[in-house]
Amino acid sequence: MARLKDMYKSEVAPAMMEKFGYKSVMEIPKIEKIVVNMGLGDSKDNPKGLEAAVKELGIITGQKPVVTRAKKSVANFKLRQGMPIGAKVTLRGEKMYEFADRLLNIALPRVRDFRGVNPNAFDGRGNYALGIKEQLIFPEIEYDKVEKLHGMDIIFVTTAKTDEESRELLKLMGMPFAK
């Protein structure tokens, strides 16, 4: 079992139950899924760049990414409907906990002059979005083999009803929020 899942069951769940006074164990919020999205604005003309980004995202998450395509044509961006514009991965279960563990304990501390993540990036329904500027913070990515730096969005989807519950859940799981 993933380390973070063990921690959730042994420490986080009881602490949440005590703080928010849930009557049932099923009321305790948990992370439902983590969506990792990589937008590749300029790679629409470069199929090799798309391939490299998809491969890197696969290495980072341990799961094959889905190539996202443009829904509509936008003339200003020289974009046609159906063109590949990014890649995303939805992680659930064991892989989700393993990825979260690697992100919180290995990758985020490697960010240059890191002071914590934005504590206000909740969406009002208990989900948290986190933006990363470059994929090099993950140890699985080799610096020499990277053609181009890509940022990514990481969205933690939780079963929490409010942002307060979600913030507490992520804080107890080790999310380094900025003061």
Curated annotation (Swiss-Prot):
Pfam families: Ribosomal_L5, Ribosomal_L5_C. Keywords: Ribonucleoprotein, Ribosomal protein, RNA-binding, rRNA-binding, tRNA-binding. InterPro entries: Ribosomal_uL5 (IPR002132), Ribosomal_uL5_bac-type (IPR020930), Ribosomal_uL5_C (IPR031309), Ribosomal_uL5_CS (IPR020929), Ribosomal_uL5_dom_sf (IPR022803), Ribosomal_uL5_N (IPR031310). GO terms for cellular component: ribonucleoprotein complex; ribosome. GO terms for biological process: translation. One of its GO terms (molecular function) is structural constituent of ribosome. The keyword DNA-binding does not apply. This is one of the proteins that bind and probably mediate the attachment of the 5S RNA into the large ribosomal subunit, where it forms part of the central protuberance. In the 70S ribosome it contacts protein S13 of the 30S subunit (bridge B1b), connecting the 2 subunits; this bridge is implicated in subunit movement. Contacts the P site tRNA; the 5S rRNA and some of its associated proteins might help stabilize positioning of ribosome-bound tRNAs. Part of the 50S ribosomal subunit; part of the 5S rRNA/L5/L18/L25 subcomplex. Contacts the 5S rRNA and the P site tRNA. Forms a bridge to the 30S subunit in the 70S ribosome. Belongs to the universal ribosomal protein uL5 family. This is Large ribosomal subunit protein uL5. It comes from Alkaliphilus oremlandii (strain OhILAs).
